[in-house]
Design a protein with these regions (language model features):
Chain B
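Conserved ABC transporter NBD signature motif
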Residues: 73-81
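Conserved signature/switch motifs of ABC ATPase nucleotide-binding domains
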Residues: 149, 170, 202
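Conserved ABC ATPase signature
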Residues: 150-154, 158
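ABC ATPase NBD coupling module
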Residues: 28, 82-98, 199-201
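Short coil-to-helix segment of the ABC ATPase nucleotide-binding domain corresponding to the Q-loop/switch region
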Residues: 110-118
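Helix-to-loop junction immediately C-terminal to a conserved catalytic motif
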Residues: 65
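Catalytic Walker B motif of ABC-type/P-loop ATPase nucleotide-binding domains
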Residues: 175-178
Length: 298, 240
């Protein structure tokens, strides 16, 4: 606008902070990258948590029974009878006798193909699926087998489950720890970047301060500015992380990446607070920094 | 120290607008730039603050507008000890002080009009209430045709006049000016002086730090003269 065109009556106060600044771009970039990393870690920890729960659940919802045939009863007949007995126990959803071939296949990695001679007494196995809501105990299975006159050993995987649960719990806590660490680092960097941005506008702060601006007045200016920038950056970072997670979910299906780190669509909702948290962190950092700078100025 | 009928020793003025009592000031651990300064200004008075470069003129002004703190002694503004004023109250006190900074301190991203209106905006004024006053004042300091210009496009003299307009637009109780005529020609210097005198007639206490001996002589106003950080004289400009 030329000076001649300046219309006093139409004048409206201009923004007290410069509209654009190259440093703002750097702040947006840093915050976006950190939000992206924090969101990816959050998704990773959710997936790790789901995977560990899955492992524990799979093991605790099943048991294996090793049949030791007695008398004239053939191993296959003993296994079939045991399966029938076990299927009737409360807390068992399914009991299935495994064929000899399946038992051999399980032993092959340990004994080798050559060792599996026809006359080698291969133990027959019964795979038992337990009701997750009220699983039958090893004792009740053993009691039912004894009552039916079947000699067998019940393995409820309790030895493995304890180890797996411990490993799963560690995985979960580790993922959560890393996630919290990244979020804290992101918050700290947002805080530092905001402080640096604020220090760059020290000349403006000084003029406002010496003209009688209150701390709240100055803080609000910077708070709004940096919260908006960080919020947008957070949106960009979280959006990118969500897009990548969606691609992984779509590409993985049931066989790809997702069985290792199972992601659910609902997990993406966990990213929603990210832009808000980035904006809030920047707003708090801006307010504290502005107050500190004004305190230094007296 | 020489004095005359217009001198105002610190302890002889009733209800002074400004009072220095045994004030010393240093930056960090450096030697004192102001030593044992004592004086008082009556409300509505007009003084020049003179002295060579480095005599402490700007430092003395900084103490008044609370950009620095005295390392010893007592500074009272509007009857209140500056050091005892709560931080939350300082902004309201600063709004009663108009300052023309030596380096102007204009906001480069704002128009001349916005810069001039800044104190009124900070004080919570509504644009409809003050836009006419701002325009009139800018016209008075010769910036009518430059109201929308950014400071970067203004000449040194125009910036100085804008800084002066910003300092006086809120009708402060006390006006401090650090070399306000340093970058303007004689004609504008006299016009600025007239503005200060006019403001003074309306009741504003004026303290102008300057090298401009001619301006001081023309005004006939009392002078506070600093030498090596010490106040050597207060009185009429011709009495030194």
């Amino acid at each position: 606008m030329s000076d001649a065109a300046f219309d006093v009556q139409r004048w409206r106060p201009g923004p007290l902070l410069p509209r654009r600044d190259a440093r703002d771009g750097a702040l947006v970039f840093v915050v976006a990258v950190l939000c992206f990393l924090a969101c990816l870690t959050a998704l990773g920890s959710l997936a790790a948590d789901r995977a560990s729960r899955g492992w524990s659940s799979q093991l605790s919802d099943s048991a294996t029974v090793v049949i030791q045939p007695r008398g004239a009863e053939s191993p296959d007949a003993a296994a079939a009878r045991a399966a029938e007995v076990l299927a009737g126990v409360k807390g068992v959803t399914e009991a299935r006798a495994l064929e000899k071939e399946k038992a051999e296949a399980l032993l092959e990695p340990w004994l080798g193909r050559e060792a599996l001679l026809d006359d080698l007494p291969i133990p027959r196995l019964v795979a038992v699926e337990l009701d997750p809501k009220g699983p039958a105990s090893a004792e009740s299975l053993d009691k039912a087998l004894k009552a039916a006159g079947v000699q067998a050993t019940v393995d409820d995987h309790s030895v493995w489950i304890a180890d797996i649960k411990r490993a799963a719990s560690m995985t979960r806590w580790f993922a959560l720890g890393v996630c919290l660490l990244i979020i804290t680092a992101a918050a700290a960097v947002i805080g530092f970047a905001t402080r640096a941005g604020l220090a760059a506008h020290r000349d403006v702060i000084e003029v406002l301060h010496l003209s009688g601006a209150e701390t709240g007045f100055v803080a609000r200016l910077f708070q709004t500015r940096f919260a908006t920038a960080a919020g947008l950056a957070g949106l960009f970072g979280a959006g990118t992380a969500a897009a990548i997670a969606a691609l992984v979910r779509l590409a993985g299906g049931g066989q790809g990446l997702t069985p290792v780190l199972p992601l659910a669509w609902i997990d993406l909702l966990a990213l929603l607070p990210a832009p808000l948290m980035a904006a809030l962190t920047a707003a708090i950092a801006a307010r504290l920094s502005a107050a500190a700078i004004l305190r230094e100025m007296g | 120290m020489s004095t005359d009928a217009d001198t105002f020793p610190a302890d002889t003025v009733d209800a002074p607008v400004l009072r220095f009592a045994g004030v010393g000031m240093r930056y960090g651990r450096s030697p004192e730039v102001l030593k044992d300064i004592s004086f008082a200004l009556r409300p509505g008075s007009f003084h020049f603050l003179t002295g060579a470069s480095g005599a402490g003129k700007s430092s003395l002004l900084k103490l008044i507008y609370m950009a620095e703190q005295a390392s010893r002694g007592r500074v009272e503004l509007f009857g209140r000890d500056i050091n005892a004023i709560a931080p939350a109250d300082r902004p309201f006190l600063r709004r009663r002080i108009g300052v023309v900074f030596q380096e102007f301190r204009l906001l480069e991203h704002l128009s001349a009009f916005d810069n001039c209106a800044l104190p009124l905006r900070i004080a919570g004024g509504k644009p409809d209430h003050y836009r006419g006053d701002v325009a009139e004042l800018l016209g008075w300091v010769g910036l009518k045709a430059r109201m929308h210009a950014r400071p970067a496009t203004l000449s040194g003299g125009e910036k100085q006049r804008l800084a002066i307009a910003r300092a006086v637009v809120g009708r402060p109780d006390i006006l401090l000016a650090d070399e306000p005529t340093g970058n303007v020609d004689q004609g504008h210097a006299l016009r600025i002086l007239r503005l200060f005198v006019e403001l003074n007639r309306l009741g504003t206490t004026v303290l102008i730090a300057t090298h401009d001996e001619d301006l001081v002589a023309r005004s006939g106003q009392p002078v506070l003269h600093l030498e090596g950080g010490r106040l050597m004289q207060y009185g009429r400009s011709g009495s030194r």
